[in-house]
Amino acid sequence: MRTLWIMAVLLVGVEGSVIQLGKMILQETGKNPVKYYGAYGCNCGPLGRRKPLDATDRCCYMHKCCYKKLTDSNPIKDSYSYSWENKAIVCKEKNPRLKEMCECDKAVAICFRENMDTYNKKERINTKIFCKKTPEPC
């Protein structure tokens, strides 16, 4: 519960793609992004990449890999242009660097929706103590 509170505090007043990512997740899944994915499994949240526990956790793993490929981007400060059209995320950003960030966020939001059947409530707030530190390569 403490982790969830900390994640909520971190998101308050934050601008940039972190907020846009949360909106995308809400639009794609209908779920509160902080509550359902803020500390899920071994890869969702601020800690480094670890071996994914399930398909939902793999979504976060792949999102971190996607962000790792970005150069000169700051997901906390940078924001991009996107819209929700006909129940689909459309990245409208002209800046190539920010468009890539938008595409990373879009991919994880869609991944969460496509893997909702693998979501394990027991992993919602994972302390990551028992997560294997050797991740697969991106």
UniProtKB/Swiss-Prot annotation:
What PROSITE patterns does this protein map onto? PA2_ASP, PA2_HIS
Q: Give positions of region: Important for membrane-damaging activities in eukaryotes and bacteria.
A: 121-133
Positions of the record's site feature: Important residue of the cationic membrane-docking site (MDoS): K121, R124
Broad class of the protein's primary localization: secreted
Q: Which cysteines are joined by disulfide bonds?
A: C42-C131, C44-C60, C59-C111, C65-C138, C66-C104, C91-C102
Q: Which GO terms describe its molecular function?
A: calcium ion binding; calcium-dependent phospholipase A2 activity; phospholipid binding; toxin activity
Q: Which GO terms describe its cellular component?
A: extracellular region
- Sites marked Hydrophobic membrane-disruption site (MDiS): F130
Give one Pfam hit by family name.
Phospholip_A2_1
Which CDD domains does UniProt cross-reference here? PLA2c (cd00125)
Q: In which tissues is it expressed?
A: Expressed by the venom gland.
Q: Which UniProt keywords apply?
A: Disulfide bond, Myotoxin, Secreted, Signal, Toxin
Function text: Snake venom phospholipase A2 homolog that lacks catalytic activity. Induces mild local edema. Is myotoxic. A model of myotoxic mechanism has been proposed: an apo Lys49-PLA2 is activated by the entrance of a hydrophobic molecule (e.g. fatty acid) at the hydrophobic channel of the protein leading to a reorientation of a monomer.
What is the protein name given in its UniProt record? Basic phospholipase A2 homolog Tpu-K49b
Q: Which organism is it from?
A: Craspedocephalus puniceus
